């Protein structure tokens, strides 16, 4: 290893250099190949990892658990209703307890400030951000690995567009990772749903060093013109009240990823990406409720069924890569 990531926290991509990020991507690819070929070696035997989930999860939980199992580590799942965190015990105290029992801690919840200044500051062991309201760093490694696998271009020449509410963890994180890796990053959203001015300014400074191209626009067609990949996410995030749906639909309807917007890219090879879960039809409880009020969205909210079920959709490859990239984080920070 050209540099040492051992015992490092993984809290946000801003904390890592481009070389460190590329190393994690290379390691992810190597570990994926080893799993597929049956030659994987275990580097985490005897390690114990705690998984704290204040928000529910399918992909993040499964990815961490399988990555740990594959590498010989043990895991303990601490769910939203299965602990004293925030009820009878502060996160600071929880960190000091778990840090004495576990070799690393994953956290998925709400506050970025809390995971950085309480959990990571007091645990004494590596802490991994499985998602907060502000950032989703493990998803970013999976997203870039997926784009790398589905493009003939060097990473720095890949272009991608994020459409939707860009103030959330996905919008913020896609802006950061692209600026770090010198990519062509486009954000298409109403202006007051853009990332904060402070984060945009920080990413533009990073882009001066890496050669990244950053575009923020309110025009969805401008955002996707010539792009290689189109990303979106749900329009209402976990923890937000249901009452915000009406306003969010009004604002974001022009940014729905449908066949017309895919075609507007002018790129017949353009791919669609989504961190999941996606409301691409009315088969889910939320989908049924929304389509009952907005019949025009019965065929999908942020993405339409025809796009999601098309060959252009690589969301499930993207989901699989959560496990390979999380495994790379674990091996590089905890491995023997």
Swiss-Prot record:
InterPro entries: Asp/Orn_carbamoyltranf_P-bd, Asp/Orn_carbamoylTrfase, Asp/Orn_carbamoylTrfase_sf, Asp_carbamoyltransf_Asp/Orn-bd, Orn/put_carbamltrans, OTCase_ArgI. Pfam families: OTCace (PF00185), OTCace_N (PF02729). Its EC number is 2.1.3.3. PROSITE patterns: CARBAMOYLTRANSFERASE. Its main location: cytoplasm. Carbamoyl phosphate binds at residues 57-60, 84, 108, 136-139, 275-276, 322. It catalyses: carbamoyl phosphate + L-ornithine = L-citrulline + phosphate + H(+). Pathway: Amino-acid degradation; L-arginine degradation via ADI pathway; carbamoyl phosphate from L-arginine: step 2/2. It is found in: Cytoplasm. One of its GO terms (cellular component) is cytoplasm. GO terms for biological process: arginine biosynthetic process via ornithine; arginine catabolic process to ornithine; citrulline biosynthetic process; L-arginine biosynthetic process. L-ornithine binds at residues 169, 233, 237-238. It comes from the Bacteria. Keywords: Arginine metabolism, Cytoplasm, Transferase. GO terms for molecular function: amino acid binding; ornithine carbamoyltransferase activity. Gene3D superfamilies: Aspartate/ornithine carbamoyltransferase (3.40.50.1370). HAMAP family: OTCase. Reversibly catalyzes the transfer of the carbamoyl group from carbamoyl phosphate (CP) to the N(epsilon) atom of ornithine (ORN) to produce L-citrulline. Belongs to the aspartate/ornithine carbamoyltransferase superfamily. OTCase family. This is Ornithine carbamoyltransferase, catabolic.
């Amino acid at each position: 290893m050209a540099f040492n990531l051992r015992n490092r926290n993984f809290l946000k991509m801003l904390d890592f250099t481009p070389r460190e990020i590329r190393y994690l991507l290379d390691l992810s690819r190597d570990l994926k190949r080893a799993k597929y070929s049956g030659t994987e070696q275990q580097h985490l035997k005897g390690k114990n990892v705690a998984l704290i989930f204040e928000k529910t999860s399918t992909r993040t939980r499964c990815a961490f658990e399988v990555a740990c199992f594959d590498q010989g580590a043990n895991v303990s799942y601490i769910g939203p209703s299965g602990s004293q965190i925030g009820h009878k015990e502060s996160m600071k105290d929880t960190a000091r307890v778990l840090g004495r029992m576990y070799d690393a801690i994953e956290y998925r919840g709400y506050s970025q400030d809390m995971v950085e200044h309480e959990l990571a500051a007091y645990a004494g062991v590596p802490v991994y951000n499985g998602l907060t309201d502000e950032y989703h760093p493990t998803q970013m490694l999976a997203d870039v690995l997926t784009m790398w696998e589905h493009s003939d271009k060097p990473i720095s020449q890949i272009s991608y567009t994020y459409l939707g509410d860009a103030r959330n963890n996905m919008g913020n994180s896609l802006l950061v990772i692209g600026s770090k890796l010198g990519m062509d990053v486009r954000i298409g959203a109403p202006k007051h749903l853009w990332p904060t001015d402070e984060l945009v300014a920080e990413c533009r400074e990073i882009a001066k060093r890496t050669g990244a191209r950053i575009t923020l626009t309110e025009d969805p067609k401008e955002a996707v013109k010539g792009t290689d990949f189109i990303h979106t996410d749900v329009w209402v995030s976990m923890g937000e009240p249901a009452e915000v749906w009406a306003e969010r639909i009004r604002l974001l309807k022009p940014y729905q990823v449908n066949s017309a917007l895919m075609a507007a890219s002018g790129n017949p090879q353009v791919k669609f990406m989504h961190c999941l879960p996606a409301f691409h039809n009315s088969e889910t409880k939320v989908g049924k409720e929304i389509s009952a009020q907005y019949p025009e969205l019965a065929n999908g909210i942020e993405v339409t069924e025809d796009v999601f079920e098309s060959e252009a959709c690589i969301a499930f490859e993207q989901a699989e890569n959560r496990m390979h990239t999380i495994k790379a984080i674990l091996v590089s920070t905890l491995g023997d």
